[in-house]
Curated annotation (Swiss-Prot), chain B:
Molecular function terms from GO: NADH dehydrogenase activity; oxidoreductase activity, acting on NAD(P)H, quinone or similar compound as acceptor; quinone binding
Keyword Oxidoreductase among record annotations: no
Record organism: Chlorobaculum parvum (strain DSM 263 / NCIMB 8327) (Chlorobium vibrioforme subsp. thiosulfatophilum)
Name under which the protein is recorded: NADH-quinone oxidoreductase subunit H
PROSITE patterns linked to this entry: COMPLEX1_ND1_1, COMPLEX1_ND1_2
Function, in words: NDH-1 shuttles electrons from NADH, via FMN and iron-sulfur (Fe-S) centers, to quinones in the respiratory chain. The immediate electron acceptor for the enzyme in this species is believed to be ubiquinone. Couples the redox reaction to proton translocation (for every two electrons transferred, four hydrogen ions are translocated across the cytoplasmic membrane), and thus conserves the redox energy in a proton gradient. This subunit may bind ubiquinone.
Quaternary assembly: NDH-1 is composed of 14 different subunits. Subunits NuoA, H, J, K, L, M, N constitute the membrane sector of the complex.
Catalyses which reaction(s): a quinone + NADH + 5 H(+)(in) = a quinol + NAD(+) + 4 H(+)(out)
Length: 213, 359
């Protein structure tokens, strides 16, 4: 019997407490939680008030050094494909064409002064797949691949999440491929004319035997 | 009991009005609560509940349509009107279609006896309170029709739960209201209100004139939550277990009618609790010395204002509870009804009887 009454008492007090809390929140709705960003010292002190963010109109600023959307500065890319190989989710697609010797001038140099030797007609990043892990960024020798502070890049059509960065149009790419093939054919012909037997490569050295355990 | 003519001047005059054979006055009297329910359900019921629930959860609620989302409800109505009115192929079509109708009629019928002011009451029955309690039970039929007619297991579960719940909670609710009827010595809503009118304002209300009225008051309030299917007694709906309970299959305007009925019932029970314990349309302000606050704030228009405000206050409490408490389990629900509320209502009944005899 005493349990019966204590249960009733517990229900009454807990309901009263709960209703007190909700009423407090109801009256606190005249306040707004501040818009302190995560790097603000007051971030965890914004306890009272509404927390709805009316998103497109209001947005919490992202940190200026944030690392979100991947960007490739294609002018600096040397087409080494390191990023392509490093990416764990295969979201980078690269195609390269070797620049012919007379094109090296047109191909240009990176901002670091390195001579570029590859055209990169296709450099696609599927930002829908990219998990911003940053592995590609760390392997890129010319530091032309990096994350930007842009955090909001949603699209209505998932196809638009494919970002194209290539530095040649399709027609240009075809021309360059043809040119390269011609040059290579030319070189092969010259080589044959010079009389070098094609199969005269020195035999590869035998590998050293693995150490015996 | 025939009420004094001064009590019902407006409604009596209206009901006598007719154009030829057409009883225009009666139609107007019937339309007044309908217009009231519609307006209140749209503004306070739907929009208010959204905002209140949002604020209690630190959200903003609707904001996009109109200033502060004020036109959101209108947009929703337009949307509901456009929706296809689906009747499931294997449903019992007759029951399925009339279910929402019965539900709405059940909550609407009780408005006939609610006094909306000292000069307006649809029907001043001498058994008004009894009628109001009884007519609520029609809701059970509507819910059963909707749940069974849907030919859907969730809907049927919801309906059966609802019947168990409403039938059970009618008992403590009725006994608690009996206490008020005993205090007043009448079942007429208008008379019960008159008993609590006086220059002292709130001091004449049953809740404050006797020491035990708080107990039936609380019991009726809790039971009324269960009768209107409001949280924490919304197990017929139970959207997380039963999808949406007895109205799982309803779409478009039928769904809207079910909700209109729910909001109508919410106001009805709130009005009944105000009439039974908080003086209905009487003003809460007392006359203090020469300051005739009570006299100033009485009259037909003020009366309507006060009862609507009291009703709205209790609806606010219902919403407040809804966003505070989790839903009860079925066994807890029955425990609360049969082992807590019913015995306490009987105790309240006996104590009230003793108090009435000794005064
Ligand atoms: S950040 Fe990671 S996932 Fe994204 S492209 Fe680079 S390696 Fe791939
Ligand atoms: S690692 Fe850098 S330089 Fe190499 S292909 Fe990728 S982006 Fe270009």
């Amino acid at each position: 019997m005493s349990e019966y009454f204590s249960n009733i008492k517990t229900s009454a007090t807990t309901i009263a407490t709960g209703m007190g809390i909700t009423l407090k929140h109801f009256f606190n709705a005249v306040k707004r939680k501040g818009d302190a960003g995560i790097d603000d010292a007051d971030y965890f002190r914004q306890v009272d008030g509404l927390c709805t963010l009316q998103y497109p109109k209001e947005a919490i600023p992202t940190p200026p050094h944030g690392r979100y959307r991947l960007y490739c500065n294609i002018d600096d890319c040397i087409g080494c494909r390191q990023c392509d190989r490093a990416c764990p989710v295969q979201c980078i697609t690269i195609e390269t064409i070797k620049a012919t010797s007379d094109d090296l001038e047109a191909c240009g140099k990176t901002s670091g002064g390195q001579q570029k030797r590859m055209w990169v007609p296709v450099f696609d990043i599927d930002v829908a797949k990219c998990m911003t892990c940053g592995i590609c960024v760390s392997v890129c020798p010319t530091e032309c691949l990096y994350h930007t502070p842009v955090a909001d890049f949603s699209e209505f059509n998932v196809k638009n999440m494919m970002y194209h960065f290539g530095n040649l149009s399709k027609i240009e790419a075809e021309a360059k491929t043809k040119k390269l093939a011609e040059q290579q054919a030319q070189a092969a012909k010259e080589k044959a004319a010079a009389g070098g037997a094609p199969g005269a490569k020195p035999a590869p050295k035998p590998k050293p035997a693995p150490p015996q355990a | 009991m025939s009420s004094s003519p001064s009590l019902n001047t407006w409604s009596d005059a209206l009901s006598g009005l007719s154009i030829g054979w057409f009883p225009l006055g009666l139609v107007i009297i019937a339309a007044i609560p309908l217009v009231f329910i519609a307006l209140y359900a749209l503004t306070y019921g739907v929009y208010g509940e959204r905002k209140i629930s949002a604020f209690m959860q630190d959200r903003l609620g609707p904001m996009e349509v109109g200033i502060w989302g004020l036109l959101q409800t209108l947009a929703d109505i337009l949307k509901l009107l456009q929706k296809e009115d689906i009747v499931p192929k294997l449903a019992d079509k007759f029951l399925f279609v009339i279910g929402p109708g019965i539900l709405f009629v059940g909550s609407f019928l009780a408005f006939a006896v609610l006094p909306f002011g000292p000069a307006f009451i649809g029907a001043d029955l001498n058994v008004g309170l009894f009628y109001a309690v009884g007519i609520v039970a029609i809701e059970v039929v509507g819910i059963l029709a909707a749940g069974w007619g849907s030919n859907n297991k969730w809907a049927l579960y919801g309906a059966v739960r609802s019947v168990a719940q409403i039938v059970s909670y009618e008992i403590p609710a009725s006994i608690a209201l009996l206490c008020a009827a005993m205090l007043a010595g009448t079942l007429s809503m208008q008379q019960i209100t008159m008993m609590q009118a006086g220059p002292g304002g709130f001091m004449h209300w049953f809740l404050f004139t006797n020491p035990i009225a708080w107990l039936p008051f609380l019991i009726y309030f809790i039971s009324s939550l269960a009768e209107t299917n409001r949280a924490p007694f919304d197990i017929p709906e139970a959207e997380s277990e039963l999808v949406a309970g007895y109205f799982t299959e309803y779409s478009g305007m039928k769904f809207a009618v079910i909700f209109l009925a729910e909001y109508g019932r919410m106001f009805m029970v709130s009005a009944i609790i105000s009439i039974a314990f908080l003086g209905g349309w009487t003003s809460p302000l007392p006359n203090i010395g020469g300051l005739e606050l009570n006299t100033m704030t009485s009259g037909p228009v003020w009366g309507a204002f006060w009862i609507i405000m009291k009703g709205f206050f209790f609806i606010f409490v219902q919403m407040w509870l809804r966003w505070t408490l989790p839903r009860l389990r079925v066994d807890q629900l029955m425990y609360l009804c049969w082992k807590v509320l019913t015995p306490f209502s009987l105790i309240a009944f006996v104590l009230t009887a003793i108090w009435v005899i000794n005064h």
